Amino acid sequence: MSKVCQVTGKRPVVGNNVSHANNKTKRRFEPNLHHHRFWLESEKRFVRLRLTTKGMRIIDKLGIEKVVADLRAQGQKI
């Protein structure tokens, strides 16, 4: 499974580790992903999403019903 947030679309980015001597080695910055269950009142069931903490804040702001409707409009199976 890829490390992508279902709500925001955030994915890993590539950068450098930089030592005190300014030597650089490649590394990946991973998004802060969590599996989280949300109760959908309209369907009387839980949905499990893989999302970042930013995605959780978006759900707190807009509501899970609106976010799930937007994801389904994009073609994601939820």
From Swiss-Prot:
Gene Ontology BP, a term: translation
Entry GO MF terms: structural constituent of ribosome
Keyword Phosphoprotein: no
Species: Acinetobacter baumannii (strain AB0057)
NCBIfam families in alphabetical order: L28
Family to which the UniProt record says this protein belongs: Belongs to the bacterial ribosomal protein bL28 family.
CC annotations in GO: cytosolic large ribosomal subunit
The name this protein goes by in its record: Large ribosomal subunit protein bL28
InterPro entries to which the protein is assigned, alphabetical: Ribosomal_bL28 (IPR026569), Ribosomal_bL28/bL31-like_sf (IPR034704), Ribosomal_bL28_bact-type (IPR001383), Ribosomal_bL28_sf (IPR037147)
Name of the gene encoding the protein in the UniProt record: rpmB
